[in-house]
Amino acid sequence: MKVRSSVKKISPDDQIVRRRGRIYVINKKRPRNKQRQG
């Protein structure tokens, strides 16, 4: 998981999710696109 100050969609399959006040990017097809805003 990458921790970044600004998260953006890398590919069209990415989903932006808000959990516990943090913003995450998840992608089931490409798990290496996982990001968290930190």
Curated annotation (Swiss-Prot):
Highest taxon, organism lineage: Bacteria
Example of a GO cellular component annotation carried by this entry: ribonucleoprotein complex
Protein name, entry field: Large ribosomal subunit protein bL36
Coiled coil (UniProt feature): none
InterPro entries: Ribosomal_bL36, Ribosomal_bL36_sp, Ribosomal_L36_bact
Family note: Belongs to the bacterial ribosomal protein bL36 family.
Annotated GO MF terms: structural constituent of ribosome
Protein's GO biological process: translation
Record's keyword terms, sorted: Ribonucleoprotein, Ribosomal protein
